[in-house]
Amino acid sequence: MSKQGDAAYAWFLKGYNCSQSVVAAFAPQLGLTEETALRLSAGFGAGIGRMREVCGAFCGVVTVLSMVYADPTDPKDKSRMYALVQQAAEQYRARNGGGSIICRELLAKAGAVPTGGTAAEERTADYYKKRPCPELCRLCADLCAEFIAAHPEGRHGFYKEDA
């Protein structure tokens, strides 16, 4: 477990969505304020806008890896970023117990009833009891931390390991 994993777990328990929790856990290393990290990732929660599509925590992984590795000045960088994201998705599928990156599938696998609509659910003890989300936030942040540590090549200068 990483300090970012613990932080992502804590952010989720404070009421932030899954994507916000993962990105905010890396805000210091990315040179972002917490507010910027939370705003940047707000719409990706609950499977992107609560549509229960791609897991919001995994969207946080994509956001963090993009901030660390993407080079918008290099036209060939898209292919490299796509490969990095696909590697991360493969690792997430293998480690999340659901074999998926789809929010509704991960919720269903955990026995939670995936609901749609735009209204965020109230965060109660029962909500946390039936959701895999806090642990998935931890897993995604751990996955990012491990990935970044294992792939120092290609990182851009603004990533601060010690922050």
Where do the language-model regions lie?
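Polybasic, low-complexity association/targeting segments
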Residues: 1-14
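Acidic-glycine-rich active-site phosphate/pyrophosphate-binding loop
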Residues: 25-43, 113-118
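Extended beta-strand/beta-hairpin segments
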Residues: 13-16, 30
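C-terminal binding/interaction regions
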Residues: 85-163
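Phosphate-handling active-site elements
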Residues: 29-39, 65-87, 152-155
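Glycine/serine-rich anion-binding loops at beta->alpha junctions
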Residues: 16, 44-63
